[in-house]
Amino acid sequence: MDSDDEMVEEAVEGHLDDDGLPHGFCTVTYSSTDRFEGNFVHGEKNGRGKFFFFDGSTLEGYYVDDALQGQGVYTYEDGGVLQGTYVDGELNGPAQEYDTDGRLIFKGQYKDNIRHGVCWIYYPDGGSLVGEVNEDGEMTGEKIAYVYPDERTALYGKFIDGEMIEGKLATLMSTEEGRPHFELMPGNSVYHFDKSTSSCISTNALLPDPYESERVYVAESLISSAGEGLFSKVAVGPNTVMSFYNGVRITHQEVDSRDWALNGNTLSLDEETVIDVPEPYNHVSKYCASLGHKANHSFTPNCIYDMFVHPRFGPIKCIRTLRAVEADEELTVAYGYDHSPPGKSGPEAPEWYQVELKAFQATQQK
């Protein structure tokens, strides 16, 4: 973000003083192909100016005696933005970062261009990390916390570079000037980063998620022949994360090559990975660390599957409400099977889904 190091002027467009130095508003192109547009006073940047770097990023602010001072805006090549406080050309002081969609992803302090002090990292799903960063600006220490999307439930303890090593259930009681105050909850459950593999769903399959446990329960579904279903414990508004969908991680090829009977609890995570909750883990007596796989299908669902970065499970999907949901209401999602796969006459879906689809389409035509 500091482009002044060993930069050699290649071309100057604008007024020059008697010594041939940029003076007034000028555009200076450097040997690195970086470009600066702004005000100069006898060869030094003074006043508003903007760097255009070779990689597509930019840095804009107010220069005094050739150095950026005060508020500056660095725009990454992908469109993300860092708004920070500069002293003598380096980040020193409060800063905020935003992603390409304008969502806040970082809030904290910088010292000599490195994150410093208590910092917050925000995920698009609503969760966050908070704590005092180490000398390298990393979320490493004994007093770091992951805060769930309710901005209250937390896992507090030891993290290394943002990865939970040992967390205990806590409640975020208050935040004063960016500093959080946590209160540890009774109990001796310990949580740690436990990303599943193709063969291990969890090293502690019967340890429930504390956030999920407050919001959902499993009971007999109200949908005919659907078995168990997922229900809301509490009344919530729209866009609320209710449950998590963890499972073993397998490939799309593996899913596509086996019988539909084995794919009852599969959910695509991305182009490479499918999350699966196979036997015997579809029984809560064998696995209850996450319950999202218990949500049944509906063509008029009250929830959706959404991406989620979980402190324990890693990248997974969650179940998020589409609308307000009442206590004891069953949570449903659209399974999203392909209704018109190429080269096939009918949908690529299990038989029960095809039957329900025809019935639903019939009601829509009335």
From Swiss-Prot:
Widely expressed. Expressed in pancreatic islets. It is found in: Nucleus; Chromosome. It comes from Homo sapiens. GO terms for biological process: chromatin organization; DNA damage response; heterochromatin organization; peptidyl-lysine dimethylation; peptidyl-lysine monomethylation; positive regulation of DNA-templated transcription; regulation of DNA repair; response to ethanol. Residues 214-336 form the SET domain. It holds the Pfam family SET. This is Histone-lysine N-methyltransferase SETD7. GO terms for molecular function: chromatin binding; histone H3 methyltransferase activity; histone H3K4 monomethyltransferase activity; histone methyltransferase activity; p53 binding; protein-lysine N-methyltransferase activity. Its EC number is 2.1.1.364. MORN repeats lie at residues 36-58, 59-81, 106-128. The record marks 245, 256, 266, 317, 335 as: Histone H3K4 binding. Histone methyltransferase that specifically monomethylates 'Lys-4' of histone H3. H3 'Lys-4' methylation represents a specific tag for epigenetic transcriptional activation. Plays a central role in the transcriptional activation of genes such as collagenase or insulin. Recruited by IPF1/PDX-1 to the insulin promoter, leading to activate transcription. Also has methyltransferase activity toward non-histone proteins such as CGAS, p53/TP53, TAF10, and possibly TAF7 by recognizing and binding the [KR]-[STA]-K in substrate proteins. Changing residue 317 to A: Induces a reduction in methyltransferase activity toward TAF10 but an increased methyltransferase activity for H3 and p53/TP53. S-adenosyl-L-methionine binds at residues 226-228, 296-297, 356. InterPro entries: Hist-Lys_N-MeTrfase_SETD7, MORN, SET_dom, SET_dom_sf, SETD7_N, SETD7_SET. PROSITE patterns: SAM_MT43_SET7, SET. Keywords: Activator, Chromatin regulator, Chromosome, Methyltransferase, Nucleus, Repeat, S-adenosyl-L-methionine, Transcription, Transcription regulation, Transferase. Interacts with IPF1/PDX-1. It catalyses: L-lysyl(4)-[histone H3] + S-adenosyl-L-methionine = N(6)-methyl-L-lysyl(4)-[histone H3] + S-adenosyl-L-homocysteine + H(+); L-lysyl-[protein] + S-adenosyl-L-methionine = N(6)-methyl-L-lysyl-[protein] + S-adenosyl-L-homocysteine + H(+). SMART domains: SET (SM00317). The SET domain is necessary but not sufficient for histone methyltransferase activity. Its main location: nucleus. GO terms for cellular component: chromosome; nucleolus; nucleoplasm; nucleus. Changing residue 220 to A: Increases near-attack conformations. Belongs to the class V-like SAM-binding methyltransferase superfamily. Histone-lysine methyltransferase family. SET7 subfamily. Changing residue 245 to A: Significantly reduces the monomethyltransferase activity but increases the dimethyltransferase activity.
